[in-house]
Structures are given as C-alpha cells and as structure tokens.
Regions:
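Active-site-adjacent substrate-recognition loops and nearby beta-strands
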Residues: 105
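Catalytic nucleophile serine of serine hydrolases
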Residues: 85
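Extended, subdomain-level signal for the structured scaffold at the beginning of enzyme domains
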Residues: 1-77, 81, 89-101, 109-155
Length: 155
C-alpha cells in the first residue's frame, strides 16, 4: 500500500538478509528482501517506522538491541510509528509503550496493560500522546485500514 501510494519503502532486518514470513505463525510463506540492517538505520533518515506483526518476527525484533533502539529513536524524535498484531510487543521492550493507548492482537493485551498501556479493541487506533503518533491495528483482517492510516499519516 505504501509503495502503491508512491512512498519509498526501506525494509531493514537484524542481519540485513531477507526476512522469512509465516502464515498463522506456523506455515512458511514468502521471503521479504531487506534493503539494510537495523544497525545502520537511523530515525533521522525516515518519516515513518512500521513494526510488522506475527509472533515470530515481533519476538525477534523485541529482543534485538538495534530494533529497540530504532523504535525509541522514532518516539524520541516525535516521528510516527505503526504496529500491527504482535508488533506492539516491541514498544514494551523499547520502553515507549507506557502511557499510550493502542490496540493489538488480543493475546498480548495483558502484556501491554502490564506495561502501562490503555488497550482498546478497534480495527485501527491513532494515539498522538507522549509527543509522537502511534498507529496500531489488531490483526491481518485490519490491514486495509492500517495501510490507509499509514499512508494518510505521512502524505
């Protein structure tokens, strides 16, 4: 959706190599080519950060020092961040979740609330609190609304 809107997209991974996606957290799906490594990414070079969903990739990002650093850089710089499904997990470990209102995949609701988040059950939620905009959605069914909100936020 971002590319279709004419927005330049950079995909970063912890290794700089392609990212394996999965369907339903168990079936291998396509690989997404990475353009750079998270270690080389700086918030000052981008307008928006999107944290992917899915248990495996979100869990990988939340324990990655460079992934957490980049999320914190975006929030500190007042730049928008989007997170879908299990993606908001990363916000907890980047220490930027507290005080925000957001949605997510239902199973991580307790983790978010324990981190000081106000959780809502909405297709899309835009939270401008704490000096930066956070756009969140619950699951893959919410992708159309999530993608539109991401495009609208930086257009």
């Amino acid at each position: 959706a971002l590319k279709k809107a004419g927005i330049e997209v950079t995909v970063a991974s912890n290794s700089g190599e392609s990212i394996q996606t999965v369907t339903g957290d168990k079936d291998w799906a396509s690989k997404v080519n990475a353009d750079s490594r998270l270690a080389d990414a700086k918030a000052s070079d981008y307008d928006l950060l999107v944290i992917p969903g899915g248990t495996v990739n979100a869990d990988t990002l939340r324990i990655d020092e460079d992934g957490r650093r980049l999320v914190k850089e975006f929030a500190t710089a007042g730049k928008p961040v989007g997170a879908i499904c299990h993606g908001p997990w990363v916000l907890i470990d980047a220490d930027v979740a507290k005080g925000k209102t957001m949605t997510s995949y239902i199973s991580i609701r307790p983790d978010l609330e324990n981190a000081g988040v106000s959780w809502v059950d909405k297709e899309l939620f835009r939270c401008p609190g704490n000096g930066w905009v956070l756009l969140t959605s619950r699951n893959p069914n919410d992708l159309p609304a999530f993608a539109k909100a991401l495009v609208d936020e930086i257009s």
